[in-house]
Amino acid sequence: MVKINSNWITITRLKSLFLFLGFLLCSMGAKADHVMGSDMGYQCLGGGKYKLIIKFYRDCRGASAPPSWSLLYWYAGNNQGQSTSRYSISMSRVGIRDITPRCSTASSPCSPQNTSYTGDGVEEHTYEANIDISKSPFTGVGLGTTYCDLTFAYNQCCRNAAITTGATWADFWTTATINVCNVNKMKVKCNTSPQLSNVPVGYACCNQA
């Protein structure tokens, strides 16, 4: 008669379960955790038309970035509040560039471009879309004094582990606000947001101030 140790079977099954859960968690982590930062601005095109511009900074150790975003939030009010709505708009990617700080002779750690888990590097992904704030659903914004601030917002998952200003794995939100009342008071009725002249510093040298 063969004696089977039930305790040994239980321990073996538990080990298998823990290994499976560990693999599952690692797989989940590998699919996200790639957002290092982003900024959002707008360019006036005239006649109430604007180009929205999103610059998304991807950690090349994480997942690849999508070719477009199709969901954008907007809300109108004073002091960036009130009347939140969803507005479906296609933010198409118009460019990708490697902004990893490195020696000129060093190869790119983000090669191939926009490929998951390639190395310790940073990519800048630029997304754009045109809107007309004189037409629906923005009709009426800025005509009085109640709804002056038109704020656009989008989110992307997930924040990477290197970010210390908030929880890792949480959604990363970015906003841009147009004060339509102030624009309407201008002679040219047109305003463009400030543009950053330098790319963000993703990595700093040891002992660098």
Give short role names for the model-derived ranges.
Residues 15-27:
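Bacterial N-terminal signal peptides
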Residues 2-18:
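Bacterial N-terminal signal peptides that target proteins for export
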Residues 31-209:
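Long, compositionally biased, intrinsically disordered segments
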Residues 12, 26-28, 125:
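Generic signature of intrinsically disordered, low-complexity, basic-rich segments
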